[in-house]
Amino acid sequence: MGSFSIWHWLIVLAVVLLLFGRGKIPELMGDVAKGIKNFKQGMADEDAKEDPRTIDAKAEEPVKDVKKTTKS
C-alpha cells in the first residue's frame, strides 16, 4: 500500500502512450522546454531593461501625535 510496484508504473506508462501516442510526447516535452527557455529569456530581458531610479523628494515634518477619542 505504501509505494507503487513496477507493474503500476508499466500500466501508467501504457495508458499514457495510448492516450498521447508515440509522436505526441516528444512534441509536448519540446513545447515545455521552449516555454522554460522563453521564461528565462524574459526574466533576463526584464532585469537588463530596468534602470536604477532615484527618488527626488524633500523631507516633510513628522506627523504629530493624535489623541484617540474612541470609547471601548
UniProtKB/Swiss-Prot annotation:
One GO CC term, this protein: TAT protein transport complex
Keyword Signal: no
Annotated transmembrane regions: 1-21
Alphabetical keyword list: Cell inner membrane, Cell membrane, Membrane, Protein transport, Translocation, Transmembrane, Transmembrane helix, Transport
GO MF annotation terms: protein transmembrane transporter activity
Residue span of region Disordered: 43-72
Membrane topology label: Single-pass membrane protein
Compositionally biased spans, kind Basic and acidic residues: 50-72
Subcellular localization, as worded in the UniProt entry: Cell inner membrane
The organism's place on the tree of life at top rank: Bacteria
GO biological processes: protein transport by the Tat complex
InterPro entries on file: TatA/B/E (IPR003369), TatA/E (IPR006312)
Gene3D superfamilies registered for this protein in UniProt: 1.20.5.3310
One Pfam assignment: TatA_B_E
NCBIfam families: PRK00720.1, tatAE
Similarity-based family: Belongs to the TatA/E family.
Subunit structure: The Tat system comprises two distinct complexes: a TatABC complex, containing multiple copies of TatA, TatB and TatC subunits, and a separate TatA complex, containing only TatA subunits. Substrates initially bind to the TatABC complex, which probably triggers association of the separate TatA complex to form the active translocon.
Task performed by this protein: Part of the twin-arginine translocation (Tat) system that transports large folded proteins containing a characteristic twin-arginine motif in their signal peptide across membranes. TatA could form the protein-conducting channel of the Tat system.
Entry protein name: Sec-independent protein translocase protein TatA
Organism: Brucella canis (strain ATCC 23365 / NCTC 10854 / RM-666)
Source taxonomy: Bacteria, Pseudomonadati, Pseudomonadota, Alphaproteobacteria, Hyphomicrobiales
